[in-house]
């Protein structure tokens, strides 16, 4: 029961009364209590109340113990029965799985045997095919050898044939010489022979039929008349010329004929021998074989009969080879003596001398005819032309046996030569027959080879068909394997159904499987089985992770909506027996063994809070039930609220237990102890600087559905307002910054103290101009808004405006342009790159740049103050949006993002530790959009935009941009869930968007390093932006740096010195922003599914938190060595009780280092502050860390967490301040009683001093604990710096008081049907502000 009392000073005293809750006792205890009650009534009636006054508490205690033991016994029996049933089910399932495994093994053995049998059959077929192939190859080889032998035999026969031709030619020449010699010998007696034989009847010779070669190599025609062969233009003009060129002239025709036919043949008139090489002439000096054989047969018929002549003529069809030795042999003489006589006769007779000119003319003027063999001077065509021009009578005379040899008689010894010629012709005919037979055999062999080649082609086709069938079978096997995996997945899904359905499906599958023959069942190899098992293990691992997340989510939801009824309730029996002493049903207020916690809160002064400030920290309206999916009646809702209050009451009772810890300023502090220090054991004074809570209130009271997402303090470093030109815009008044007013009024120098989390050891610390102004991102069902407050006056909202209609996930304050920033041109290629080569690829320090660097002056973007800017375009269908209003606003975006991330197989352990040489970096260029029209419709509503769209600034009426809204000044960068990035000014005209760009995925984190802004996207890429030449941010050119797979996101980033640490999956990538290279990668957690969520840096240490993990890990900033592990779950369980409100599952949702403290926010709304120490004392007195100093390292100690770590400053500079490692000890941890109902969304630290403004009025009175409430005004106090730490989250709770809804009973007592508000004040989004004093390092 909540009671509120007003004191005279205007303050409100609020305290909590305990009262009983109605719980039913067991029947046995109730009956026993009734019996004892009646007995007590009888005793009181007889003897008065004093008799049972001392006895009744003992009896009540016994009954309570009995009731608790009885309930525990019943629970144990129920649990035992459940365990027995589970055991039986497990045994049954084990037996069934065992039988199924045995069946599967048997089937696998059968499959393997069938596969082996099929493999053997295929092997036999392959061997058979190989044997046939070898046989065919052997046959082909034999045929090739036979063909080669036949070709050799054919060549040999050709050689023999040529030899026979040569011999035949020689014989013919010898025969012709013999005939000519015989004629020459019989020249003298020819006249006598004719006179002695006057009555000899002979036939006339054919006209001009002379076959005897003369000296000039021409065959002469004698008969009268001019012979004009066809085509001859060298014929003789008249008979006189023909007769003058002959060897002899006869006075009459008869002598002319005999002289012409008996003329001697001489090689030349000059007597010289011809040197013409050996040439081939046709047989009997005739070229056309078929036409020239007939006259030659007639010529031979002098010694043979007509039949033999015809046989020789028909069988002679080859050319005669004339050897070179026979070219100088004279024709017509048998010896040299006879030739000398003839030569003398020729020389003495001028008529016998042939004219050289005529011979030359006759022999050299025919292009187609002439002497073939110059050695013998024979005209090969003369006989042919004579026969062709002669009539049929002459040819008939020749066939009948004309006397070609004239009147000469032939001797008998010449008939033997003709026989030999006939034998040669017969042998020639036999050789021709043999040749024809060989040709027939050759043709048969060629046909056989063709047949074998065809058979080989057929076999090749069959083999190719077998290969194709094999490929088809392999594809079929793969399809069956895919179907098997699909069926397995369906079976796994079916296992999750009720057990009866699974059994029915299993029996059905077994029945169907039995119907299929063994040969047709699916087969898969051992490799496939191993792959399936590996995939199953991966799916199991992912399923366990998802079950863990679901378990945590269900635990939180159940703790809110369906809390379990507690076992032990002391007030039940007391309420039953209280009726003995009082007739009133209302229980008396219970006495406390400890003083009640009072909260004094005075009204603020004029300079401080406004009058609409709440009167007390816990002045909270009636609580309401959380968001429910199904409507419940009023009775169920009341029971749920009652159970929730009981849970918070148990937490309150546990917190109030005296465990030796101190309570001061709303914190649970450990007992004081003296901490060892390197100086000699002086007491550490940091324990005295306890954070003081100064403010707690809903951020926006008008809209109860507002949710907080993120926040950031304004960083004004590097910005000098007095340098701005007043003509270009309104000059910011220094008084507009409340922090500036307060510090100037107090006489403090402006921003002279450095923020400890922003210090860098290697550069000169400059004046930190961090403002006390804080930008907080809130969202409703439709829009996201920015609420700007001053931490010194958190109750006053400076300004608020709408950003977009999607959730804004991150915000970061970017300082003004500084001389220490990287030059803007370093991210471009060399200046000599042609701007027109838009497709050129360049390499810059190992970075792949896509496109070319065009140094274009893009006008600065500007978005007018709008309430509904970026609408999700069609190309971004995968990005979640809340425009339709169907997304649950209470669902955390980080949980939604976790659900979309799928763990990949990832590299091996060895690959995980290696550093990649360089990420894939893409240089993106976006074309400037055209100047928007006068309409106020945003450019993002066109619907045709793509990733990288730039919204350009709207030009003011004056045509110039105000310098106060220039992005060269401090700016605030906001990243939305739909991929939009907004840039607003942090100094003036906050509502005006200076730049905006659409990226390809959700923006999750933003950091700034020396003129570079790194934007982490949900697809695992980093977008790196830089300033332009004029100092303003240029969003038209940026780099995309790919860190991994697109289904893993970069969840967090932190600036460590001049490096950026990126949390990607379970790894931390250390990136150099200047070179855009990954310098180092290491695993922050051994499991790939455990993602890095928060990073906090100070000095030489970086604290890292892991998703769904309560352990914080400390890593060295330079060596990346794992230094310390801190688990907060035991501490939270000890402070708030194990299992209370689902606190057994602790996860870290917010992390910050401020005021020399490590601030930790959990998913349960608990805020923990751990002082940072230079040394950590373990239980055995061992030191965990030492102060860093300027000495050289001596050894490499500290290889594991808990060892001694020696850290040394930078040796390159003597002026560099030595940094320290921020160790933490849970023995010094401090838990704040002020927390949130849901997860702590963010921590923000800004400089400020609220205590001076409130004149000592704080939320928790300093008198509660011995800790100081405000810094002392002595010399030590002048060195202390003040900082304000803000936390934001859903709802508010004080763990010392409980739910804070006890006043709801009184408010709702009068009207039972009163409708409760949709969201109580305690469940709205709250911000809590602490002030902490610390000594700068």
UniProtKB/Swiss-Prot annotation:
Keyword check for Cell inner membrane: no
GO biological process: anterograde axonal protein transport; axon development; axon guidance; axon regeneration; forebrain development; in utero embryonic development; JNK cascade; lung alveolus development
GO molecular function: JUN kinase binding; kinesin binding; MAP-kinase scaffold activity; mitogen-activated protein kinase kinase binding; mitogen-activated protein kinase kinase kinase binding
Record PTM: Phosphorylation by ROCK1 is crucial for the recruitment of JNK.
Chain residue ranges for the region called Leucine zipper-like domain (LZ): 424-459
Entry-linked Gene3D superfamilies: 1.20.58.1770, arf6 gtpase in complex with a specific effector, jip4 (1.20.5.1000), YVTN repeat-like/Quinoprotein amine dehydrogenase (2.130.10.10)
Ranges of compositional bias, category Basic and acidic residues: 639-655, 739-765
UniProt note: phenotype after gene disruption: The cerebral cortex in the embryonic brain is a little thinner and the distribution of neurons is more disordered than that found in the wild-type littermates.
Family: Belongs to the JIP scaffold family.
Protein name: C-Jun-amino-terminal kinase-interacting protein 3
Organism: Mus musculus
């Amino acid at each position: 029961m909540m009671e509120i009392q007003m004191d005279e000073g205007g303050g409100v005293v609020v305290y909590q009364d305990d009262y009983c809750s109605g719980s039913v006792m067991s029947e046995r205890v109730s009956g026993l209590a009734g019996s004892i009650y009646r007995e007590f009534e009888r005793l009181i009636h007889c003897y008065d109340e004093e008799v049972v006054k001392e006895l009744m508490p003992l009896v009540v205690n016994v009954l309570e113990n009995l009731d608790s033991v009885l309930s525990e016994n019943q629970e144990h029996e129920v649990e035992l029965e459940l365990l027995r049933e589970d055991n039986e089910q497990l045994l049954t399932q084990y037996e069934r799985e065992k039988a199924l495994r045995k069946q599967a093994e048997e089937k696998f053995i059968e499959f393997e045997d069938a596969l082996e049998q099929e493999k053997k059959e295929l092997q036999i077929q392959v061997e058979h095919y190989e044997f046939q192939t070898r046989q065919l190859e052997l046959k082909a080889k034999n045929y090739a050898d036979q063909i080669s032998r036949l070709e050799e035999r054919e060549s040999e026969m050709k050689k023999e044939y040529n030899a026979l031709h040569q011999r035949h030619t020689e014989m013919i020449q010898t025969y012709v010489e013999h005939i000519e010699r015989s004629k020459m010998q019989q020249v003298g007696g020819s006249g006598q022979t004719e006179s002695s034989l006057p009555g000899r009847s002979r036939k006339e010779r054919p006209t001009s039929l002379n076959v005897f070669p003369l000296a000039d190599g021409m065959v002469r025609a004698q008969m009268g008349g001019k012979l004009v062969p066809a085509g001859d233009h060298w014929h003789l003009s008249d008979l006189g010329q023909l007769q003058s060129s002959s060897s002899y002239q006869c006075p009459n025709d008869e002598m002319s004929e005999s002289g012409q036919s008996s003329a001697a043949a001489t090689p030349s008139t000059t007597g010289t021998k011809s040197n013409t090489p050996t040439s081939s002439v046709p047989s009997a000096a005739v070229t056309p074989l078929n036409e020239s054989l007939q006259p030659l047969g007639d010529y031979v018929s002098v010694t043979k009969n007509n039949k033999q002549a015809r046989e020789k003529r028909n069988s002679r069809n080859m050319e005669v080879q004339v050897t070179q030795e026979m070219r100088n042999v004279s024709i017509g003489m048998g010896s040299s003596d006879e030739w000398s006589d003839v030569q003398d006769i020729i020389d003495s007779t001028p008529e016998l001398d042939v004219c050289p000119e005529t011979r030359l003319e006759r022999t050299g003027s025919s292009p187609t005819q002439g002497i073939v063999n110059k050695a013998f001077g024979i005209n090969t065509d003369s006989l042919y032309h004579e026969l062709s021009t002669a009539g049929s009578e002459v040819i008939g005379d020749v066939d009948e046996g004309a006397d070609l040899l004239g009147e000469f008689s032939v001797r008998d010894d010449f008939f033997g030569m003709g026989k030999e010629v006939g034998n040669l012709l017969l042998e020639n005919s036999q050789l021709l027959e043999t040749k024809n037979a060989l040709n027939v055999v050759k043709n048969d062999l060629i046909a056989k080879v063709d047949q074998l080649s065809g058979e080989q082609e057929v076999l090749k086709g069959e083999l190719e068909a077998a290969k194709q069938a094999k490929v088809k079978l392999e594809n079929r096997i793969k399809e069956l394997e895919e179907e098997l995996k699909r069926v397995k997945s369906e079976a796994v899904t079916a296992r999750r159904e009720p057990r009866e359905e699974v059994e029915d499906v299993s029996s059905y599958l077994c029945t169907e499987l039995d119907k299929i023959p063994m040969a047709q069942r699916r087969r898969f190899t051992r490799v496939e089985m191993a792959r399936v098992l590996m995939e199953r293990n991966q799916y199991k691992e992912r399923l366990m992770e998802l079950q863990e997340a679901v378990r945590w989510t269900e635990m939180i939801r159940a703790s809110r909506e369906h809390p379990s009824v507690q076992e032990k309730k002391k007030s039940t029996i007391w309420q039953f027996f209280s009726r003995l002493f009082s007739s009133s049903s209302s229980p008396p207020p219970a006495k406390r063994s400890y003083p009640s916690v009072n909260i004094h809160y005075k009204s603020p002064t004029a300079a401080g809070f406004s009058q609409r400030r709440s009167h007390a920290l816990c002045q909270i309206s009636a609580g309401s039930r959380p968001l429910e999916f199904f409507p419940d009646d009023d009775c169920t809702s009341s029971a749920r609220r009652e159970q929730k209050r009981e849970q918070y009451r148990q937490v309150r009772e546990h917190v109030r237990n005296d465990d030796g810890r101190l309570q001061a300023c709303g914190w649970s502090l450990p007992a004081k102890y003296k901490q060892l220090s390197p100086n000699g054991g002086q007491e550490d004074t940091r324990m005295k600087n306890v954070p003081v809570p100064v403010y707690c209130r809903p951020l926006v009271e008008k809209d109860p559905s507002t949710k907080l997402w993120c926040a950031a303090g304004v960083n004004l470093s590097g910005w000098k307002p007095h340098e701005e030109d007043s003509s270009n815009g309104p000059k910011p008044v220094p008084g507009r910054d409340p922090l500036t007013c307060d510090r100037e009024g107090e006489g403090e120098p402006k921003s002279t103290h450095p923020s400890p989390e922003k210090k860098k050891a290697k550069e000169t610390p400059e004046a930190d101009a961090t403002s006390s102004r804080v930008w907080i991102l809130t969202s409703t069902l439709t829009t996201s808004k920015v609420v700007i407050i001053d931490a010194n006056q958190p109750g006053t909202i400076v300004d608020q405006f709408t950003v977009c209609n999607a959730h804004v996930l991150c915000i970061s304050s970017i300082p003004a342009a500084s001389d220490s920033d990287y030059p803007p041109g370093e991210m471009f290629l060399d200046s000599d790159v042609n701007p027109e080569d838009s497709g050129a690829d360049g390499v810059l320090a190992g970075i792949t740049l896509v496109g070319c660097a065009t140094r274009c002056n893009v006008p600065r973007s500007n978005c007018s103050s709008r309430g509904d800017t970026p609408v999700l375009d069609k190309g971004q269908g995968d990005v979640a949006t809340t425009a339709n209003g169907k997304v649950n606003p209470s669902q955390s975006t980080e949980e939604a993002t976790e659900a979309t991330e799928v763990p990949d197989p990832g590299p091996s352990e060895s690959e995980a530790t290696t550093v990649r040489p360089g990420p894939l970096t893409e240089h993106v260029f976006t074309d400037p959009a055209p100047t928007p029209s006068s309409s106020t419709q945003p450019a993002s509503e066109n619907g045709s935009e793509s990733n990288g769209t730039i919204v350009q600034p709207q030009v003011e009426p004056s045509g110039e941009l105000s310098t106060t809204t220039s992005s060269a000044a401090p700016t605030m960068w906001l990243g939305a869930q739909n991929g939009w990035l907004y840039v607003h000014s942090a100094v003036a005209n906050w509502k005006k968007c200076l730049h905006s760009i659409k990226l390809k995925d959700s923006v999750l984190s933003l950091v700034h390093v020396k003129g570079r802004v790194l934007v982490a996207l949900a697809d695992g890429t980093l977008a790196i932006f830089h300033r332009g030449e004029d100092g303003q941010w240029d969003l038209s050119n940026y780099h995309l740096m790919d860190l991994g797979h697109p289904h893993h996101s970069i969840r967090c980033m932190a600036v460590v010195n001049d490096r950026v640490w990126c949390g990607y999956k379970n790894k931390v990538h250390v990136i150099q922003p200047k070179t855009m290279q990954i310098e180092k990668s290491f695993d922050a957690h051994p499991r790939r599914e455990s993602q890095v969520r928060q990073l906090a840096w100070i000095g030489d240490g970086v604290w890292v938190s892991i998703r769904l993990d309560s352990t914080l890990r400390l890593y060295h900033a330079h060596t990346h060595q794992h230094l310390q592990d801190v688990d907060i779950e035991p501490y939270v369980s000890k402070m708030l009780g194990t299992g209370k409100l689902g606190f057994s599952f602790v996860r870290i949702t917010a992390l910050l280092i401020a005021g020399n403290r490590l601030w930790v926010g959990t998913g349960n709304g608990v805020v923990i502050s751990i002082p940072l120490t230079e040394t950590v004392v373990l239980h055995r007195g061992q030191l965990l860390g030492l102060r860093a100093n300027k000495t050289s390292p001596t050894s490499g100690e500290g290889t594991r967490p808990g060892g001694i770590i020696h850290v040394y400053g930078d040796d390159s500079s003597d002026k560099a301040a030595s940094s320290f490692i921020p160790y933490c000890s849970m023995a010094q941890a401090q838990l704040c009683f002020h927390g949130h109902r849901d997860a702590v969304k963010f921590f923000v630290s800004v400089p400020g001093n609220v205590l001076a403004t409130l004149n000592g009025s704080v939320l928790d009175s300093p008198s509660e604990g011995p800790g100081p409430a405000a810094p002392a005004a002595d010399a030590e106090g002048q060195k202390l710096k003040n900082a304000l730490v803000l936390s934001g989250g859903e709802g508010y709770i004080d763990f010392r008081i409980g739910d804070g809804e006890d006043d709801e009973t009184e408010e709702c007592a009068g009207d039972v049907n009163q409708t409760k508000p949709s969201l109580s004040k305690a469940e709205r989004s709250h911000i809590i502000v602490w002030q902490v004093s610390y000594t700068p390092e």
